[in-house]
């Protein structure tokens, strides 16, 4: 439970889950909360038992909190045994099927075809910024306070010299 993957080498991060009681899998959301970074490009894949409504709002919330970009969501019906459906053997038996899987592949191919170059360009900018930040560390909170104090002291020196 405390092992988290390094997602930094990936241009697009795909988070896939079934929908459980209207939400993405809690463990997947925990991993996303721990691993996503500012500027990550995320695509959500989901299977749902009920209607095709936006069930990925919890993944969207995690992405917003981490300043990652949720590009799009793809969903298809999945086998569901929630509540009364359990009594009749479930609904959407045999789903996702090959047609649903082909739809997901076509969805991804369209995404790469339409936005692949843009995503690669943005990733190159991000890699350049990461390299700069690694070469020039900010120094943390105390360093920022010292730098601010020095700037304020210089302003007071200038006003004293002017008088």
Residues of each region from the PLM?
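A short beta-strand-loop structural module common to alpha/beta enzyme folds
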Residues: 1-4
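FMN-binding flavodoxin-like domain, especially the glycine-rich phosphate-binding loop
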Residues: 9-163
């Amino acid at each position: 439970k405390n092992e988290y993957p390094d997602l930094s080498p990936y241009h697009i991060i795909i988070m896939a889950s079934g929908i459980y009681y209207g939400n993405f899998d809690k463990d997947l959301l925990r991993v996303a909360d721990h691993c996503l970074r500012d500027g990550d490009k995320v695509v959500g894949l989901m299977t749902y038992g009920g209607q095709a409504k936006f069930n990925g709002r919890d993944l969207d919330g995690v992405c917003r909190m981490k300043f990652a970009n949720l590009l799009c969501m793809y969903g298809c019906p999945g086998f569901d045994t929630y509540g009364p459906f359990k009594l009749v053997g479930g609904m959407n038996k045999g789903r996702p099927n090959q047609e649903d899987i082909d739809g997901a592949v076509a969805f991804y191919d369209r995404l790469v075809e339409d936005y692949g170059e843009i995503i690669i360009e943005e990733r190159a900018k991000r890699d350049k910024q990461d390299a700069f930040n690694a070469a020039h560390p900010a120094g943390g909170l105390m360093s920022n306070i010292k730098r601010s104090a020095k700037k304020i002291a210089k302003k007071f020196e200038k006003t004293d010299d002017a008088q």
